[in-house]
């Protein structure tokens, strides 16, 4: 499985998931007007969202 770890104007960065990590996740929370803290990567289980954040998980490449 290959997950996106970062998106920018220059393209995307990806990582190959380790054995046992079969889910890609995107975790983001609002830090201010039009400002978000975003984390992406591989995981074994879908993480829970913080009170002021959101999480999206999938099990397909990129």
From Swiss-Prot:
Pfam families assigned to the protein according to its UniProt record, in alphabetical order: Toxin_cobra-type
InterPro entries referenced in this protein's UniProt entry, alphabetically: Snake_3FTx (IPR003571), Snake_toxin-like_sf (IPR045860), Snake_toxin_con_site (IPR018354), Toxin_cobra-type (IPR054131)
Main localization of the protein described in the UniProt heading: secreted
Disulfide bonds: 3-24, 17-42, 46-57
Location in or out of the cell: Secreted
PROSITE patterns: SNAKE_TOXIN
Source superkingdom: Eukaryota
Tissue-level expression: Expressed by the venom gland.
Gene Ontology CC annotations of this record: extracellular region
Kinase keyword on record: no
Keyword Cell inner membrane: no
Gene Ontology terms, MF aspect: toxin activity
Keywords annotated in UniProt: Disulfide bond, Secreted, Toxin
Similarity-based family: Belongs to the three-finger toxin family. Short-chain subfamily. Aminergic toxin sub-subfamily.
Assembly information from the UniProt record: Homodimer; disulfide-linked.
Protein's job: This protein shows a synergetic toxic effect in that it enhances the toxicity of other toxins.
Record-given protein name: Synergistic-type venom protein S2C4
